[in-house]
Structures are given as structure tokens and as C-alpha cells.
Amino acid sequence: MKYLDVDGIGQVSRIGLGTWQFGSREWGYGDRYATGAARDIVKRARALGVTLFDTAEIYGLGKSERILGEALGDDRTEVVVASKVFPVAPFPAVIKNRERASARRLQLNRIPLYQIHQPNPVVPDSVIMPGMRDLLDSGDIGAAGVSNYSLARWRKADAALGRPVVSNQVHFSLAHPDALEDLVPFAELENRIVIAYSPLAQGLLGGKYGLENRPGGVRALNPLFGTENLRRIEPLLATLRAIAVDVDAKPAQVALAWLISLPGVVAIPGASSVEQLEFNVAAADIELSAQSRDALTDAARAFRPVSTGRFLTDMVREKVSRR
């Protein structure tokens, strides 16, 4: 495993574990998964050197935090547990109460990394961040982070906090590389981290899905799996497959290896089984050449997906044509 040293947090594994799926019926996991496989996955993650475990108060309405805290056991104080507060009425007293509730569910006195889940479109960070500052000053959290913030808003959060907001968790993958343009350079320059969620684009970068093999369930509603986007992404997938052959790995592992080869970037893929966790963690051992890394970066930047509106229009048209 590779690690980054982060101020206020300590060693953060470059491959972490996203736990949004713990107890999530929408993704087919459910209660049995939560009480069995989830615990096995967390224990195996610790054995493999994973130190970053991401959750949030809204994941399963607190269930993810409870399962994670229970599964970590005595290790819960030895790792970087990252949770998030959803910024509804994000005033200092509310944020403190919500953080304390998350800490109780996680069975922690102190949450190492506490993040604002998304920017509030109405309430500015000058109102939100004083609550985070109070939590830092009281020692209830180790560091403050944000999620889904633009660079401009990240800078405003910094100013409002009066100290560095150490992380920004964003949608980031070869299929969604926007963070390359500004967030990653900022993180490198300012010694921050970018936490990449959905790093495998819901399985698209694993090479399993294509025009002849469409996903079902909620994935089918992801615009990336639309007909035109599956055509447009093929050059990127071809590059990914070719490099995977060169390094004797799978495309999904190369996609993760590309992310964590970038300065200040860590990835938090989910896992539905111990085997999937082991597969993801193995990506940390892949060393990409500069040529391979650049080829993937170029292919990612060249991918131009169609808009959501176009995706929806195409989807309706295709369904009508099948009648």
C-alpha cells in the first residue's frame, strides 16, 4: 500500500474504502450484506493496510456509520475515518450536534476527517465554516474537508475556516477527469488531497460493459452508459485495455493506478465482497510508466460525453423504436 501524510490526519492510504453501499438496498446489498460481508471487508481492508474509510451521515440514514464503527472494532481509533455532514441548516450549533451524533454512531470520540458533503447553494461558507472551526478547536475532529466543491468555493472555504481545508472529495475518474484541470494542481501546490469517489465510473472502466452488454438497475440511468457515450468512450477503453495487458493487470486496476499516480489523489472505491476489495487494493502495487500515464490522461481528456439531455432524448427514442 502507498500512503500520503496529511496534516491533522496522519497516514492516508492511496486506496481507501468507500462505504456508501453499507446497508444500501438500492444497490442490492441490504441487511444481510451489512451484518456479514461488510464486516469481513473492513477487517480484510485493515489487514491489507487500508487506513482511509469514508462514510456519511446520510448513507443509509446513519446505518453506514454504525456498521463501519462496529466492523472496525478496536482499530477505529487507529485509522482515518472520514464522515460527512449534509449542509441543511449548517449553523455552528447544528454542525456540532450532527458531528457528535456521527461520532456516537462510529463509536469515536474524535472523527479524524469531517467533511461538508456538498456546497449549500444558499448558505455561504462564511456561515458554515465557523462550526467546523469550533470542532477543530475543541478537538472533536482532526481536520476539515469538503466534498463536491469547485476550486473557487474550496478557496472560499479556506478563507472562512481561517486554516487549510485539507481535502475535497469529488467525482473523479478517467471517465470524469475534470479535477485534473484545477483541483489536482491546487492540491499539489497547497499540500492538500483530492479524494476520488466513483473512481471506476460505476464499473464502466472495468471493461465489462459496452454496446453489446448494457448494465441493468440504477446503472442504466447513468448517462455514461448511453449508446452515444459508449461509442465515444471506446478509444479510452481501448487505451486502458492495452496498458492493462502491458502491466499484467485488469483495466479497472489500471484506472485506479492512474488516479493514485496523480499528486495528492486518493481513491475510495466501494467493495461488495472481500475479493473485490483485494482486487482494488492490488492497484496500489501497479507502477505506471510516464508514457502510460500520459496516454491515459490524454485519452481521458479527449473523451467528450453527450449532455444528460441528449442521453435522455436518445434513451426515449431507443425505447420507442423497440416497440
From Swiss-Prot:
Keywords: NADP, Oxidoreductase. It comes from the Bacteria. Signal peptide: none annotated. GO terms for cellular component: cytoplasm; peptidoglycan-based cell wall; plasma membrane. One of its GO terms (molecular function) is aldo-keto reductase (NADPH) activity. The active site is at Y59 (proton donor). NADP(+) binds at S198, P199, L200, A201, Q202, G203, L204, L205, G206, G207, K208. Its EC number is 1.-.-.-. InterPro entries: AKR_Detox_Biosynth, NADP_OxRdtase_dom, NADP_OxRdtase_dom_sf. It is an enzyme of class 1 (oxidoreductase). It holds the Pfam family Aldo_ket_red. Belongs to the aldo/keto reductase family. Aldo/keto reductase 2 subfamily. This is Uncharacterized oxidoreductase Rv2298. The lineage of its organism: Bacteria, Bacillati, Actinomycetota, Actinomycetes, Mycobacteriales.
